[in-house]
Amino acid sequence: MTPANLLQLIILAAIWGASFLFMRIAVPALGPVWLIEWRVLLGALLLALAGRWFRHSLALRAHWRHYLVLGLFNSALPFVLFAWAAQTLTASLLSVVNATAPIWGAVIAWAWSREPLKGRVAAGLALGVAGVALLMGLDPAMLKPGSGWVLAGVLLAPCCYAIASHYAKSARNALLPYANAHGSMWAATLLLWPVLPFAGHAPLPETATPVLVWGAVLGLGLLCTGLAYLMYFRLVAALGAASALTVTFLIPVFGILWGHLFLGEAVGWQTLAGALVVLTGTALVTGFDPRTLWVRKAVSHG
C-alpha cells in the first residue's frame, strides 16, 4: 500500500464514520427506507454530474444486471439495515458492527476465490476485532433492553458489503470504478422505489427540524455515498477486496469521535487504546510498511 492509498483509506473512514451520525439524526424523521432512498438518489445524481464532467459512460444496456447485483448488496440492503438499526442502536455501536466486514470478507475470499488466509492477515483481523472490543469497552450498557435482535439483524449488513466487494473485484477489469459506483446507486434507487408506499414514514413530519434533518440527508447522500463510494471502488481496484475492506477497521474511530462531538457519547481510555490496536491490525491486513514513507522522501530529495 502506498502512502496515497493510506491517506485515502483514512479520509474514507472519516466520511463513512459520519454516516452513522447522519442516520441517527435523520431516520426518526424520515424512516429507514425513505432516508436510504434519498441517500442513494443524491449519490446517483452526484455521480451522474461527475460522469458528465469526465465523459464516462455507464453502458447500461450491457451491464444492467451487474449494476443490479451491486446495487442490492452494496447499497440497498446494507443501507436499509443500518438505517433500521439506527432507530435503536447508537451511532458508535453501529460503526463497530460495520467493522466486522473484513472478517466476513476474509471468509468469503476463501470460499469465493480460494484466496489463502495468510498468517499476517489472520493476525491483523484478530487485532482489528480486539481493537473494536477495546473501543467499545465491552460495555453491556451500550445495548438497550430488547435491542439484541436488532444487533443480530444488522450484522447482515457488513456481510452484504463483503459479498459486493468480492463481486466488484471479479468484474473490475470490465468496468471502471466510476461505473460500478454510479450504476449501483441508480440500481439501488430503482430497487427501493416500489417499497416506498409501504415504508410507513412520511417524507418529513411537521415536528422535525428541517435544517438539521435535510443537512443530515445531504451529508449522507452527497458526501457519504456519492463521493465515498467512488473512492471505495478505486481502493478495491488498487488494493484488492480484502485490503480495501479494512477501511471498516478505521470507521469506529471516527464513528465514536463524531458521536462524542455531536451526540454527547462518552469517550474513555479504551478509545485511545482501541484506536492504536485497530490501526496496527489495519497495517497488518493491508501490508502497509511505514518505512516506505522515508524511502519515498529519500528518493524525492535525491
Question: Where would I find each of the regions flagged by the language model?
Answer:
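Specific transmembrane alpha-helical segments of multi-pass solute transporters/efflux pumps
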Residues: I15, S19-F20, A48-N98, L134, ...
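Hydrophobic/aromatic residues within transmembrane alpha-helices
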Residues: A26, L35, R39, A85, ...
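Helix-helix packing/entry segments at the starts of transmembrane helices
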Residues: I36-W38, S75, F79, L93-T100, ...
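Transmembrane alpha-helical segments that form core, pore/gating elements
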Residues: L47, G105-V107, A111, L125, ...
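C-terminal transmembrane-helix exit sites in multi-pass transporters
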Residues: L46-L58, F82, A101-A126, V253-A273
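Hydrophobic transmembrane alpha-helices of multi-pass small-molecule transport proteins
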Residues: L47, L68, I108, L117-D139, ...
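Transmembrane alpha-helices of multi-pass small-molecule transport proteins
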Residues: V27-L77, P102-G105, C159-A164, A181-A202, ...
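Juxtamembrane helix-entry segments on the extracytoplasmic side of multipass membrane proteins
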Residues: M1-L6, A29-V33, E37, A59-R65, ...
